[in-house]
Amino acid sequence: MFRNQYDNDVTVWSPQGRIHQIEYAMEAVKQGSATVGLKSKTHAVLVALKRAQSELAAHQKKILHVDNHIGISIAGLTADARLLCNFMRQECLDSRFVFDRPLPVSRLVSLIGSKTQIPTQRYGRRPYGVGLLIAGYDDMGPHIFQTCPSANYFDCRAMSIGARSQSARTYLERHMSEFMECNLNELVKHGLRALRETLPAEQDLTTKNVSIGIVGKDLEFTIYDDDDVSPFLEGLEERPQRKAQPAQPADEPAEKADEPMEH
């Protein structure tokens, strides 16, 4: 991971045209626990996997309330996410106080992009090490946005970020055509199935490690934790078991291992 003199500061470009400090911040997002966002014609849903630092600690909150029509889920550094969430809450309050209307979701995401871009260009600062999935509902309908430490943001029909999130994205891509016509319960189940793909084979979703956020038409942003998640998990079919690979006979020489793939 050492980049010689090209990763000492965020204002230094490498000869290949890369800013390594931003790439390191993107890696912090990949280390966070997975979260999934998806939407239908009427609702947007966030599903997040919660972690506990130890057996003695409570599970960390992964879905945060921003306004009545907006919520976020996070992957990466929780402290950075808390600061960005407070900024978003203040912008929503300002909109209601000054203009007497809720802040459009796309406008809020644009403000977040502007705020997260500043540390990528100024000496002595570091990028925010957190990725956000933003779910909201406004006059344009439901929205799912993804933001990155690089200050890029994307409007998505469905997205997953965090550790092992590629498995969840594969599920979302396979079933994306079904989401727009789903009712709320079916949409949440799709999110849970996608999130379950990020877990090791010996683990499963429980009321302790799952959090759900829902917003939509005539429904303010609501977070479901602990026992409130039970009705959604009860309707979820059991996880299909993966076939175990047959053991190699001891008297046969082991085949030469494949060369490691480059990352």
UniProtKB/Swiss-Prot annotation:
It is found in: Cytoplasm; Nucleus. Keywords: Acetylation, Cytoplasm, Glycoprotein, Immunity, Isopeptide bond, Nucleus, Phosphoprotein, Proteasome, Ubl conjugation. This is Proteasome subunit alpha type-1. The modification Phosphoserine is found at S110, S177. The 26S proteasome consists of a 20S proteasome core and two 19S regulatory subunits. The 20S proteasome core is a barrel-shaped complex made of 28 subunits that are arranged in four stacked rings. The two outer rings are each formed by seven alpha subunits, and the two inner rings are formed by seven beta subunits. The proteolytic activity is exerted by three beta-subunits PSMB5, PSMB6 and PSMB7. Interacts with NOTCH3. Interacts with ZFAND1. There is a cross-link at K115, K208 (Glycyl lysine isopeptide (Lys-Gly) (interchain with G-Cter in ubiquitin)). GO terms for biological process: immune system process; negative regulation of inflammatory response to antigenic stimulus; proteasome-mediated ubiquitin-dependent protein catabolic process. GO terms for cellular component: centrosome; cytoplasm; cytosol; extracellular exosome; nucleoplasm; nucleus; proteasome complex; proteasome core complex. Its main location: cytoplasm. Induction: Induced in breast cancer tissue (at protein level). Up-regulated in liver tumor tissues. Glycans are attached at S110. The modification N-acetylmethionine is found at M1. SUPFAM superfamilies: N-terminal nucleophile aminohydrolases (Ntn hydrolases). Residues 253-263 have a biased composition (Basic and acidic residues). Belongs to the peptidase T1A family. One of its GO terms (molecular function) is lipopolysaccharide binding. Residues 232-263 are annotated as: Disordered. CDD domains: proteasome_alpha_type_1. It comes from the Eukaryota. InterPro entries: Ntn_hydrolases_N, Proteasome_alpha, Proteasome_alpha-type, Proteasome_alpha1, Proteasome_asu_N, Proteasome_sua/b. Component of the 20S core proteasome complex involved in the proteolytic degradation of most intracellular proteins. This complex plays numerous essential roles within the cell by associating with different regulatory particles. Associated with two 19S regulatory particles, forms the 26S proteasome and thus participates in the ATP-dependent degradation of ubiquitinated proteins. It comes from Homo sapiens.
